[in-house]
Amino acid sequence: EVLKQKGYSTAIFGKWHLGSQKEFLPLQNGFDEYYGLPYSNDMWPFHPQQGEVFNFPDLPTYDGNEIIGYNTDQTRLTTDYTTRSVNFIKKNKNKPFFLYLAHNMPHVPLAVSDKFKGKSEQGLYGDVMMEIDWSVGEIFKALRELGLEDNTLVILTSDNGPWTNYGNHAGSAGGLREAKATTFDGGNPVSYTHLTLPTTER
């Protein structure tokens, strides 16, 4: 909202999870564009504990304030979010913009597009991470081609630690103790890095 007041074009593509009623959706909270899922990609009728523990309704996909479908094929999400992000950057190359790209992957259930399926030789989780790496590369490619790389702050961060009760397909905490849903180092720390620092001040 602050950036929008300063004349920035704003967009979020991906996971929102800050409320799914209309007044809580992105377009009512500072964003010009929104495409994605309103909450976690596992909150749908195909959850392995559906009926036993959960009773999730169909999972909507939003474009702006409109629901455009339910239970979207999740193998498309990373590519769809990336395509929209690149198009947003190109459309706003001559003005300030704020892009929030919040991939649903690698949150379970994992899904990967056909072009990356089996490509990592490290299983499904490896394929998913490879596609996310490709996505980051596409963002940088667009910034470079438009001459915006030196005038854009890019921050890469992640969610909590891995959900190890889903097995090794949900990631690894490496040598850190425990995982998601604990207060130990394997669950709470969030990785962060700034990949670029603008060379000009605004």
Language-model features and meaning:
Residues 1-195:
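Formylglycine-dependent sulfatase
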Residues 194-202:
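Single conserved hydrophobic/aromatic residue that forms the stacking wall/gate
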